[in-house]
């Protein structure tokens, strides 16, 4: 059957259409993505303003039409941290439902981490052993660890690349004092969780998902996206550490000229790099592998599991 997953994230609203059947690998059929940057549309009270809600409803309608055009039988719509943490989240959800008919499911941070872990486990298989999975989104950092398809530990931290950039790096290029302060903040937040994972033992395989990690891997020498999903891509901590000061010295325009870095994400790449560097250092990760699947695929896989029961 043809499934669609509608992901309302902090940076983008992304419709992914796949042909999927229980027991088979989902095959991508269509992708429709609009940059909305919901996290930047919050007012001083933490609410998504009327203009932001109007934009969100319009983009959801557009995605709904795209899903219909592509013959989607079952649409799985969800929202993550930008909506979850908005002070008027209930009103936003009600407006979207009233204007589009779409009922957005708001995932908790822990659910994001668990579903992303499921996607990584299915991609790498049981032979990967104990997995540590890292995912930097626009609003949050998810960390999950486990032997099975359900992680033994899963946390979500407010360390998304977009959130940190908006709150802590106001200048372009950023002021060195702000960069140092952000580095301290990131490492303090991550360090609070390390003990919870350390007691479970060292992972056999460390993987990372989503756009920020893919872009960081690309600028440090990993294969281009055009070379396909099945090319192994790694991010080495030593390479990342060498790039962080270079990114800090660049403007967002200069970062957008780097290989694999989109103009819409260039402004937040430094914050993402500081989070990635901090996580890899504190979890003593020398190298990690990029997983092509992430949260959206996890949502699809969970739906297929329920269909097969």
Swiss-Prot record:
The keyword Magnesium does not apply. CDD domains: ASKHA_NBD_MtPPX1-like. InterPro entries: ATPase_NBD, GppA/Ppx_hydrolase, Ppx_GppA_N. Transmembrane segments: none annotated. Disulfide bonds: none annotated. One of its GO terms (molecular function) is pyrophosphatase activity. Keywords: Hydrolase. Belongs to the GppA/Ppx family. PANTHER family: EXOPOLYPHOSPHATASE, RETROGRADE REGULATION PROTEIN 2. This is Uncharacterized protein SCO3348. It comes from Streptomyces coelicolor (strain ATCC BAA-471 / A3(2) / M145).
């Amino acid at each position: 059957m043809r499934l669609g997953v509608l992901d309302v994230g902090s940076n983008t609203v992304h419709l992914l259409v796949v042909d999927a059947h229980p027991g088979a690998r989902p095959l991508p059929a269509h992708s429709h993505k609009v940059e909305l940057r919901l996290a930047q549309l919050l007012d001083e009270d933490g609410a998504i303003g009327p203009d932001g809600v109007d934009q969100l409803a319009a983009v959801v309608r557009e995605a709904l039409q795209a899903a219909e055009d592509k013959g989607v039988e079952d649409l799985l719509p969800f929202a993550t941290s930008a909506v979850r943490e908005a002070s008027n989240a209930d009103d936003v959800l009600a407006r979207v439902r009233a204007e589009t008919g779409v009922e957005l499911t708001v995932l908790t941070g822990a659910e994001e981490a668990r579903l992303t872990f499921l996607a990584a486990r299915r991609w790498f298989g049981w032979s990967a052993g104990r997995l540590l999975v890292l995912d930097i989104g626009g609003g949050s950092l998810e960390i999950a660890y486990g032997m099975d398809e359900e992680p033994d530990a899963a946390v979500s931290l407010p360390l998304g690349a977009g959130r940190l950039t908006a709150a802590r790096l106001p200048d372009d290029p950023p002021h060195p004092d702000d960069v140092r302060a952000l580095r301290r903040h990131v490492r303090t937040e991550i360090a609070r969780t390390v003990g919870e994972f350390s007691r479970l033992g060292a992972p056999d395989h460390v993987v990372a998902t989503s756009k920020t990690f893919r872009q960081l891997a690309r600028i440090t020498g990993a294969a281009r996206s055009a070379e396909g999903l099945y090319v192994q891509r790694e991010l080495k901590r030593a390479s990342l550490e060498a790039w962080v000061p270079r990114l800090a010295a660049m403007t967002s325009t200069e970062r957008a000229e780097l290989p694999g870095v989109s103009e819409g994400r260039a402004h937040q790449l430094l914050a993402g790099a500081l989070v990635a560097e901090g996580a890899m250092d504190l979890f003593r990760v020398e190298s990690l592998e990029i997983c092509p699947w992430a949260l959206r695929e996890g949502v699809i896989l969970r739906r297929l599991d329920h269909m097969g029961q």
